[in-house]
């Protein structure tokens, strides 16, 4: 035994001298696991006729195979949902699978089927590694292609053929900007793979464990704001000596306290701010602002924007725009660790678009888009990576909004929903909206080409319809209206659409448009009509609020156009409600 150990130790030393530490580790591992044959005493139960490597005591312990957990699926779900869930869990090894039925979300939820009709079911799952996700995504793509005869749209799947040299070059490009240890910038590929299957409205998200903790998509697709948030968060005690190291920042506790103080001032401004007191609020905010965190800069953008909308002389739109530039040129933030700059850039582009939309008629549509183009160019140059803006619903909505010019915000689906929720007490301001026809065509085509299957979702077509109505383009309005009515699958949803359309027309208050609604679509014997869908929906509205607002809307139209016979049938209908 002693002689054998000396021989192997000598071999290890020679290996270290000739080949370095790698072979040394292999030899050491061999020494550790090699059984001792020359024992002074042998176990009496050992069968000497069996080679040592086949003996039971030298076999590794058998690990029990964990049973794959399949989440409970909605009863009304199509068979394809169960098929894909079992496929990724049982065949591809994706764990912690969760399924979200977007039809169960409330109407005002940003991911509900009432707001967007493309996604109906969301599947979330965790992969073991980036390579695992790449392999699973590749197999999933081939499976859907051959079994469902459609080509899924997959994002985040990057081939492993990117070599070390290319990755080093990407890293050098990123290093020119502030450090961003939590942002991939195209280097950490396949940490989040999204697959729009094209099958029954099913979208699959597969992420690594770390990426899933960071993104917390569960909150996005759940009605509960704190949905299992503790499941994918690290439990780090503030008193832990490694608190800062684990979080990846230096003095963030102090910084967050400062950001909280700024939030108090901001909330007080929203609640109690008046024109005469704006300067006092601004002075208080500026005195607290230190610029030591992205949270402070983000709060400053929101704060200054509110003041600018209330008093353009105190804070101009250009001053709000300068805050973004100050944020990305800050030396303090450049030294801060743990900032997801990719996420910050995406959010700031959206905020900048909101600013351009809120300034009213200060800029023409062409000027707005030129300013947006310059801003996006500056931001993407900073990140060193492209930002997939057209995959964000709010970006598409705001981009369409920027094709118009108006002194007030347009009436949209959110405003109409507020009218219903308040039983008609909310009165939106509606007036003339101008739209640049050339820019409208360009933005519409650009958006269409960027969408899956180049098909506009229903919510976007509804937004276009509302814009056409407020710009007076009634031919386009009724074209979109007819297309939407035909695309809505159930009579229940169409009843809601009939209600919202009438509310919109009553607020715009165009006589010809109202007459078209009541003469062509109220009780048409051929094609779609309100009365047909109302009867199919068991002669009822979807809520008491809808019934109350619909009745009041028809009565208001009667008061405005009392002598016109084209709405008499509707007036008689609501009298019996």
Swiss-Prot record:
Span of the transit peptide along the chain: 1-38
A Pfam family the protein falls into: RsfS
Membrane topology, from the record: Peripheral membrane protein
Keywords attached to this entry: Membrane, Mitochondrion, Mitochondrion inner membrane, Transit peptide
Gene Ontology process terms (BP): mitochondrial gene expression; mRNA stabilization
CC terms in the record's Gene Ontology section: mitochondrial inner membrane
Cellular compartment(s): Mitochondrion inner membrane
SUPFAM superfamilies: Nucleotidyltransferase
Protein family (similarity comment): Belongs to the ATP25 family.
UniProt protein name: ATPase synthesis protein 25, mitochondrial
Gene: ATP25
């Amino acid at each position: 035994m002693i002689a054998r150990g000396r021989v192997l130790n000598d071999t290890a030393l020679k290996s270290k001298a000739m080949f370095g530490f790698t072979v040394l580790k292999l030899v050491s591992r061999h020494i550790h696991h090699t059984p001792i044959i020359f024992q002074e005493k042998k176990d009496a139960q050992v069968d000497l006729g069996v080679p040592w490597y086949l003996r039971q005591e030298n076999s590794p312990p058998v690990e029990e195979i964990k049973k794959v957990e399949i989440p409970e699926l909605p009863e009304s779900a199509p068979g394809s949902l169960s098929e894909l869930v079992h496929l990724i869990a049982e065949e591809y090894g994706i764990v912690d699978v969760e399924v979200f039925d977007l039809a169960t979300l409330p109407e005002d939820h940003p991911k509900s089927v009432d707001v967007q009709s493309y996604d109906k079911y969301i599947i979330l799952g965790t992969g073991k590694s980036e390579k695992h996700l790449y392999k699973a995504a590749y197999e999933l793509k081939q499976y859907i292609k051959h079994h469902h005869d459609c080509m899924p749209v997959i994002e985040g799947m990057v081939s492993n053929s990117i070599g070390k040299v290319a990755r080093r070059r990407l890293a050098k490009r990123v290093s020119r900007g502030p450090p961003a240890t939590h942002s991939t910038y195209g280097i950490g590929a396949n940490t989040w793979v999204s697959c729009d299957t094209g099958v029954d409205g099913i979208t699959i998200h597969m992420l690594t464990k770390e990426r899933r903790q960071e993104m917390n998509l569960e909150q996005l697709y759940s009605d509960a704001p704190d949905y299992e948030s503790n499941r994918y968060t690290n439990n780090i005690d503030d008193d832990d000596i490694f608190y800062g190291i684990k979080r990846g920042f230096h003095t963030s506790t102090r910084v967050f306290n400062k950001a909280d103080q700024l939030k108090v001032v901001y909330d007080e401004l929203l609640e109690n701010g008046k024109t005469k007191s704006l300067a006092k609020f601004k002075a208080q905010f500026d005195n607290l602002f230190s610029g030591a965190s992205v949270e402070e800069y983000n709060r400053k953008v929101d704060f200054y924007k509110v003041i600018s909308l209330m008093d353009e002389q105190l804070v101009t739109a250009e001053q709000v725009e300068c805050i973004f530039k100050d944020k990305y040129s800050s030396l303090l933030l450049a030294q801060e660790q743990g900032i997801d700059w990719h996420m910050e850039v995406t959010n700031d582009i959206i905020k900048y678009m909101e600013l351009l939309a809120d300034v009213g008629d200060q800029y023409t549509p062409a000027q707005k888009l030129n300013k947006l183009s310059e801003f996006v160019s500056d931001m993407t140059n900073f990140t060193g990576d492209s930002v997939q803006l057209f995959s964000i619903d709010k970006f598409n909505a705001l981009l369409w909004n920027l094709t118009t010019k108006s002194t007030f915000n347009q009436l949209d689906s959110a405003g109409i929903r507020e009218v219903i929720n308040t039983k008609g007490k909310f009165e939106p301001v509606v007036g003339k909206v101008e739209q640049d026809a050339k820019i409208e065509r360009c933005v519409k085509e650009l958006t269409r080409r960027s969408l899956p299957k180049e098909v506009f979702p229903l919510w976007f077509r509804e937004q276009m319809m509302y814009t056409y109505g407020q710009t007076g383009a009634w031919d386009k309005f009724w074209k979109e209206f007819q297309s939407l009515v035909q695309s809505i699958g159930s009579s229940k949803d169409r009843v809601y659409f009939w209600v919202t359309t009438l509310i919109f027309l009553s607020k715009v208050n165009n006589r010809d448009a109202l007459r078209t609604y009541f003469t062509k679509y109220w009780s048409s014997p051929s094609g779609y009509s309100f009365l047909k869908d109302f009867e199919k929906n068991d002669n009822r509205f979807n809520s008491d609020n809808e019934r109350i607002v619909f009745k009041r809307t028809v009565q208001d139209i009667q008061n405005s156009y009392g002598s016109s016979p084209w709405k008499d049938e509707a007036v008689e209908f609501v009298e019996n409600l």
